[in-house]
Amino acid sequence: MPLSLSSRVREELAKETCEKLSTQHQAKKKAKAIDRDFFLSVLGSSATKREARSYIQNFKPPNTAPTKSKIQESTQQNSTENGANLGSIYTATRAVAESPKFVQQPVLPKPAPEGPLLHVALVKIRAPQLLDDETLSGIGKTLSRLSRLGLVSTVVVDGDDGSDTFLRISNCEWRNMVKEQAARVVAAIDASGTEARLVDNVIGIAEDGSNFEQRPYLKGRVHVTLRELLMTPLRRGVLPIIPSIGHTDITQTVVSATANDVVLALTREFAGIWSSESPDEHPNVVKERLQALRSEVSLDRLILVDPLGGIPASDRKNGYHVFLNMEQEYELAKQDLINRGGMHSVAPQKPTLPEASANFTVGDPILLSSFTENKPGELDDSPPPQNGSPAKHDPRMKFHLENLELVRSTLSLLPPSSSALITTPHEAANSEKQPEFKAAGVGTRRQRNPLIHNLLTDKPAFSSSLPVGRLGPMDKNEPISSSTKFAPTTFAKHGMPVTIFPDPKTTPWQPPIAGVPQISLTDPQIDLPRLVHLIEDSFNKKLDVQHYLRRVNNRIAGVIIAGEYEGGALLTWELPPGVPDGSEESRKRMVPYLDKFAVLKKSQGSGGVADVVFKSMVRDCFPGGDNPVNKWYFERSRATLKLSDTNWTMFFTTPEENMDHQTFKDYEAVCKFFGRENVGGYYQQGKRGIYVLDSE
């Protein structure tokens, strides 16, 4: 009997050991699978060496080990306080050390030891109740990968699906639905290996009648009540999931808030813009506290996951903005949405819930059935209104307009390095799976997750200056088509202004007319020394300024400057050899030639400076260079030609239907002349390219 009992004990122990080993093996297998998915998604982002270096520089953990000088300084301070070689025998007692000190000025608090800077993304997911578990799981995996790459997300759940659901159910049922969807998001992130937490008590709402001063951007009725409810999980790598509900400040009544107001409140909190300070506080104390808040966290990204996708654009045949330079394009994009939505410049009303009291406006109900005839992210193919003709009401534009306003308001509160991304749930859930389509021609690319790609490169998945036919999606063997549709994702930055001389809105760029004065580089509007520095810094070559001015001053078509001379382009009108200058046919046969295209070295590969300049050329200056040949130029050209008997390549953007034999010969003649004469003012080594421009 004892033998039988001991045998059973050994058998049970062996079985338990096997189960533990099996569990450990399964855990290791799962961890390896997660690592594999993670590395595949990162490698699939196709970041260049320059982009990878920039990412590592921004997201590498700080060196927290104390330096030798700091250790010596601390030692000297202790020895001074204790006396020379006396140790701690004669140190001041605790009572003396903590006794009040009478000083004339307030004693500033000692700064707390700095921890690593938290890089945060603010994510808003709209209408998660419309998403199946697989898509939501994919979004959870993406947010988990962002966290592993150093970008921790704070997620706001928006239950507004555009229907009249909140009018047909009670407020309690609505809140429960939003919390239920927030719990689904938590479960999706937890399943991906990253911890998430539901935080439904962090948003406060100022009540009606309270002594409250509303300030655009800087103050709102919706605010964060306790910062540590956000920062504690973020420091531990836990993702806070916040439903769009809040508590009133005085009565602590649970009410619903618009998700956009919650996003703005979180933005203000992370940016350290609004915190409850006493009017009696010393300004230096306030300054120290704000600096401490801003050194603790950096809000790097605003990510809007919306069933409708990015911001639509009527001037792009693919239908969407790829990149929005908010400083330059916000008003144009806003007016375009108003026209397409049939709003006629009426300010949009935000859809809200009735229980939000008089602080919020209840918008007109928008039936989901009114815009679900198209798949999420698709737009109506009907053309935009022309010549002031009334457009049919499109309720989808209301959501796009709110997203555009939210992006602008958020980026206005953040440093220029911050950016925003608007994409569809399908794109946000995209991982390393094989793409359903492939791009065509020289622009062939693998399908990428826009969130991962944007974190590593600070760029959109596709360049905004690429011709539509290079963007995909289409089969490799399918011809390039101007009607090509692609993933509706919009990347936005606060950006920079673009200055064009002369302004094409008032003075269209046209070939010079005899007797009419032309713009020159010595014009007072143009800062010639800064322009020369831009060209020399970009090409790392010295420019013969006087020789260059003699050649171009009578032939300048225009100058484009991005920001504070961070990038620019100079275009000239050129004649094919053999055509007499000043003749009747000379003006008709003049070729628009991209003479210089330059970007400061510090701005190359980031910020979209080159795309901003290039897009201004083809869109604003010619609506409807002497540089090394690279893929960037090849991708943006309609076609290229290797010039015979030279080491030059000609690029041109003229559509095939507008290219007759004579125009093509004129292009070729001008480019051959420039290639042989090298009239650019300095020499370039290796392969070379010349760009001629025409209407898109």
Swiss-Prot record:
Keyword line: Acyltransferase, Amino-acid biosynthesis, Mitochondrion, Transferase, Transit peptide
Enzyme Commission identifier(s): 2.3.1.1
Main location: mitochondrion
Gene Ontology, cellular component aspect: mitochondrial matrix
GO molecular function: L-glutamate N-acetyltransferase activity
Pfam families to which the protein is assigned, alphabetical: NAT
Region listing for Disordered, in residue ranges: 59-84, 371-394
GO biological process terms, semicolon-separated: L-arginine biosynthetic process; ornithine biosynthetic process
Pathway: Amino-acid biosynthesis; L-arginine biosynthesis; N(2)-acetyl-L-ornithine from L-glutamate: step 1/4
Places the protein is found: Mitochondrion
Domain N-acetyltransferase: start-end pairs: 515-676
Protein's UniProt keywords contain Iron: no
Reaction it catalyzes: L-glutamate + acetyl-CoA = N-acetyl-L-glutamate + CoA + H(+)
Domain of life per record: Eukaryota
Top enzyme category: transferase
Function statement: N-acetylglutamate synthase involved in arginine biosynthesis.
PANTHER family: AMINO-ACID ACETYLTRANSFERASE, MITOCHONDRIAL, N-ACETYLGLUTAMATE SYNTHASE
Protein family according to the UniProt entry: Belongs to the acetyltransferase family.
Annotated protein name in UniProt: Amino-acid acetyltransferase, mitochondrial
Higher taxonomy: Eukaryota, Fungi, Dikarya, Ascomycota, Pezizomycotina
Gene expressing this chain: arg2
